[in-house]
């Protein structure tokens, strides 16, 4: 396997059928049949032919195939691309069809899907603490690490042992620390999930998701299911995601370094903002041994802080120059979000910080200035 930077640029070379150096935007939804390959659907052994000879873009199209080639190489498995991270999670639930789902702290959208499955099909939801007591063969254990919105890490290897001892499968959502920061396969994950909207996309202008599995047959079934779920990534988004992947390693490395510097500054100077800054959450502040073992390439670019009042949470974003007050994360621009705006389950004094590719020094000065204003007013 070549290095990450090379795979990001050349992992789809084998799928290239044009002389364009940059992949073209394929807007067609339908493609002419090959006159030399007129074989009825019922006589096909499988649907792999659509990746080389596309038929209809809901099934596959040139740039979705290129994306899956790159993701399969850089994520060391069989990748299936989707229209969003939540579409990828839902596809996993449809495919594995568990009777019980064990979920810890996680993105509220995942919880909403779990609630739909419970309401419609009676799937049981349990906390991670109940694995030993309640889990059985074929159940799903779902873990985010690092977790949204805190950016803190959980022990993947320990949870994998607990899940596998009961015959359950472990899905790890590694969106907040995609490679080269973390390789969830190495710690026992059975399925790895990413919202490609975030760091892989990296420009706050597309939606996509990826599931990565270990067996080719599983990926084939997921792709077949995707045809009828209608959740393939769209043509324009796939082109934009291909463009973004070329620079992904440079961006994620810079963002990781910046976030670690910001967290270190806040931790070192917390006493200067003692009327405002209550708590700082980030993997770099954790002392457990597993954290550095998992995050081999650096800490995630998201962290969270809690302030003392809701009013301070409203005011902080207004005082920042280089952080947009917006939801989502992973783009080259830094964002802050008073998380209560979009997450109904969260502490209403929590601010999530998604660190971009600006100068770390400028970001530190900006955040320090805003906190000082609130400190002086407290």
UniProtKB/Swiss-Prot annotation:
Keywords: Lyase, Pyridoxal phosphate. It comes from Saccharomyces cerevisiae (strain ATCC 204508 / S288c). This is Uncharacterized trans-sulfuration enzyme YHR112C. Belongs to the trans-sulfuration enzymes family. GO terms for cellular component: cytoplasm; nucleus. SUPFAM superfamilies: PLP-dependent transferases. One of its GO terms (biological process) is transsulfuration. GO terms for molecular function: carbon-sulfur lyase activity; pyridoxal phosphate binding.
